[in-house]
Amino acid sequence: MKKWLMVQGTTSDAGKSVLVAGLCRVLARRGIQVCPFKPQNMALNSAVTPDGGEIGRAQAVQAQACGIAPSVHMNPVLLKPNSDTGAQVILQGRALSNMEANAYHDYKKVAMDTVMDSFQRLQQEYEAIMIEGAGSPAEINLRENDIANMGFAEKADVPVIIVADIDRGGVFAHLYGTLALLSESEQARVKGFVINRFRGDIGLLQSGLDWLEQKTGKPVIGVLPYLHGFDLEAEDAIAAQQNLSADRQLRVAVPVFTRISNHTDFDPLRLNPNIDFRYVGQGESLSGADLIILPGSKSTRADLAYLRSQGWDKEILRHLRLGGKVMGICGGFQMLGEWVHDPLGIEGEAGSSEGLGLFAMQTELTAEKRLTNVQGHLTLDGQTVAAQGYEIHAGRSSWAADQKSPIILSDGSLDGLVSDCNQGFGTYLHGIFDRPETALRICQWAGAKEIEAYDHRAAQERAIDRIADAIEQHLNLTLLWPDL
């Protein structure tokens, strides 16, 4: 029996991505061929598929939960915001164009065809598809031409469950109100509710559950407990949980740009118990770090200007004068060069921006985006380790032949630079910290000589298994699939 199920939420960050990942693992454990699907995702955290396409990072993690490789059809529409009112539109893994919100609203009728094409392809290949909605289905202003929530569910004729986060408060108002704002046909599609992140005695919640079921005629499929210490890659929001301790072996600071991208790069550092890790926000200081890492950016020149507006450029130069280490990834790497040129206006107004000058490097932004998974070797301080990652960038950087590139890729090409003073390191590789030995080598280069390796992939697997175990224990899945 085919199993299609869509998880929608009362709000953003209600737990949709994690619940879908857990359901994928539950079904995969039973030998069911399952895959994830998200019709439309708006996020700056993305992943590269084996065939060189770009999808939301959450769907790549959900594919991992299924034990399969990610595909562009698992997230056929990806929106990557590049301003407050516009985004780059990516269809089935390939960049289409930049669109303002009004233009994209009109385009959604066309985008729905792409969404349905991908979904139908997956239906032919898999026994089960766990579908993730976006935000809330009850956003009145977004319901016209909706392709992300009930608009898709109606078109594809799939059942829906609605999840809400009780830890935020107001869970019954969220669930009852969301259902009430749906049309009759949409309400009929809802098979039940899931309450997420509950702390305390479940008996004290029972009267509320009974009221909700009586008022809506829908069952509460289950109540998932608050999982202390749980961490799985965030879809887009910066993780609120920092890893602060005065006795850690390495202190890492990452400035949060206005268009920061792929901040999941830092999860292997943020979750490493040996590292004092912090994100540095507006009005905060970078001081006190051993290693400052400039992250990726969807708008490199704009974020370079933002960096200067915060005074972080002066703090970085002072950090270097005092012997500290600085690293840049992708857009952050470009910022560490001498100039970033945008003659075609790829990221906005055409022009050039002066970089921080740590590397004798020029970057020109181009219309062609490089999307690829890579492997190779990294050499720092004379020690070589295996390295891997993925590239997602529109810029091309050039530097003099006598500059030192620390990464040799499997095709013989070079990536990144190390400064002559050995205090700066830049690379285009997202995910460079995912391999334990690579992260360890970089941390040792930054001064943490006694630090231990941290296996982030293994930690991810434990997190996926943990949410799957909670689903098995606390959700009545036979309400969804009697034959399971």
From Swiss-Prot:
One of its GO terms (biological process) is cobalamin biosynthetic process. The keyword Transcription regulation does not apply. The active site is at C330 (nucleophile), H430. The keyword Repressor does not apply. One of its GO terms (molecular function) is catalytic activity. Pathway: Cofactor biosynthesis; adenosylcobalamin biosynthesis. PROSITE patterns: GATASE_COBBQ. It comes from the Bacteria. Keywords: Cobalamin biosynthesis, Glutamine amidotransferase. Residues 249-438 form the GATase cobBQ-type domain. HAMAP family: CobQ. Catalyzes amidations at positions B, D, E, and G on adenosylcobyrinic A,C-diamide. NH(2) groups are provided by glutamine, and one molecule of ATP is hydrogenolyzed for each amidation. Belongs to the CobB/CobQ family. CobQ subfamily. This is Cobyric acid synthase. The lineage of its organism: Bacteria, Pseudomonadati, Pseudomonadota, Gammaproteobacteria, Vibrionales. The gene is cobQ.
